[in-house]
Design a protein with these regions (language model features):
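Auxiliary, metal-adjacent structural segments of Zn-dependent hydrolase domains
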Residues: 2-101, 147-151
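Eukaryotic basic, amphipathic alpha-helical target segments in cytosolic regions
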Residues: 55, 116-124, 142-150, 178, ...
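Short pre-active-site segment immediately N-terminal to the catalytic Zn-binding motif
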Residues: 91-108, 124-131
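Post-HExxH zinc-binding segment in Zn-dependent metallohydrolases
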Residues: 120, 124-171
Length: 208
């Protein structure tokens, strides 16, 4: 196990112990839902299987439940529910940020798509086109852009709803990339790779 992963896990472990009883309850609930998804979620099991077949098996301990930085969430227009660390290969699930187990399932699936892309396609996360492609795929394949999720966000569309959601969320994510100078650059990156990346559903046969 890499030293980078150990350092990242230790930092998250330290954070987990600082939030009092409420934080511990959130982390316990997160772990319970995570355990269920790793046993029963079709999308999670499918991605875990294909990651293993590709030589990138994901041990359960590499999927970490921990509190996320509330100041970062407050500064974002899209509250954070998870993340993927290219350096360590670990996935973070933000304990206390999920309104349902289905929400966690979509988040974990999203981050596993990033991990799949990182493993198979050697993504350069500082390259905006690379980042945009993985965000398009992760948002499209994870269930993040289901109509019910969009309604919960207060976004109601009846024409090309899925595509518009994927595009919007991909632009938001790329805009947050440290290498991205502004939203316009993020939009250009998403537009440049849109056709090929939206059509690429690997390892799924179709959009989940």
């Amino acid at each position: 196990m890499s030293s980078a992963f150990e350092k990242w896990r230790q930092r998250l472990s330290d954070m987990t112990g600082l939030g009092g009883d409420q934080t511990k309850l959130h982390c316990q609930g997160c772990e319970q839902w995570k355990s269920h998804l790793l046993q029963y979620s079709p999308s999670v099991l499918f991605l875990m299987k294909h990651l293993k077949l590709s030589g990138c098996a994901v041990p359960p301990e590499n999927i970490i439940c921990a509190p996320c930085d509330p100041s970062a969430a407050a500064a974002s227009s899209t509250p954070r529910s998870g993340g993927f660390s290219p350096t360590s290969g670990a996935i973070l699930l933000c304990a206390g940020s999920f309104f349902s187990r289905s929400h966690m399932e979509q988040t974990l699936t999203h981050e596993l798509v990033h991990l799949y892309d990182h493993c198979l396609f050697k993504v350069d996360w500082g390259n905006l086109r690379h980042h945009a492609c993985s965000e398009i795929r992760a948002n499209s394949l994870s269930g993040d852009c289901k109509w019910t999720r969009e309604v919960r966000r207060g976004v109601v569309r009846f024409s090309k709803q899925h595509q518009e959601c994927v595009r919007r969320r991909a632009v938001l994510s790329v805009t947050s990339n440290a290498a991205c100078p502004n939203k316009e650059a993020a939009e250009r990156a998403v537009n440049e790779v849109w056709d090929s990346c939206f059509a690429d559903t690997r390892p799924f046969d179709e959009i989940y």
